[in-house]
Design a protein with these regions (language model features):
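C-terminal effector/interaction modules appended to NTPase cores
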Residues: 1-170
């Protein structure tokens, strides 16, 4: 989805977090070679809908949905890539989708949580927790800006259930 700005064939774009290297995560810079919206090819698209973006990238880089959850923007304009994050937390009274009225228990350190940040989903392991905030180490990095909402899910009865949300702090 294009949520902000415009994109045209020939534009230079940056993809973050990018790809994993032996030095960490490296953004990918490439050019837009084609744009498709609906069933038609376009030269330019504006925010407000789903867009297929063709690039000059080797298909091996994008295999197995390895770019899932990545952000695209003009080089140098995207938020930072985070491998650890801190957020203010608001837990729900009851876990969504559980049978009965499953109360949400307080968060615990080292408890795996599923965190959804924009279109990125990753496992977060809490390092420090108190009733108002959480600091977590992420299994996969995310590209996110301060103030962004993060959905927090916990594994209950072998399934992930929404238990609250957080607001990203820097």
């Amino acid at each position: 989805s294009l949520i902000q700005g415009e994109l045209a064939v020939g534009d230079e774009i940056e993809i973050r977090p990018g790809r994993k290297t032996n030095r960490g995560w490296e953004p990918i810079v490439t050019n837009v070679t084609s744009l498709h919206s609906g069933s038609s090819e376009r030269k330019r698209v504006a925010a407000g809908g789903l867009v297929a973006i063709g690039t000059g990238l080797d298909p091996a880089i994008t295999k197995s949905d390895s770019m899932l959850g990545s952000l695209i923007g003009r080089p140098g304009t995207l938020p930072p890539v985070l491998e650890k994050l801190r957020m203010d937390v608001q837990l729900l009274d009851r876990a969504v989708g559980t049978s009965g009225s499953q109360q949400v228990e307080a968060l615990r350190t080292k408890e795996p949580l599923m965190l959804t940040v924009g279109t990125s989903t990753t496992v977060g392991i809490p390092i420090q927790v108190n009733e108002k905030w959480l600091e977590a180490s992420l299994k996969l990095p995310v590209c996110a800006a301060e103030g962004q909402r993060i959905a927090i899910s916990r594994r209950i009865d072998a399934r992930w259930h929404l238990i609250g949300y957080g607001i990203l702090q820097t």
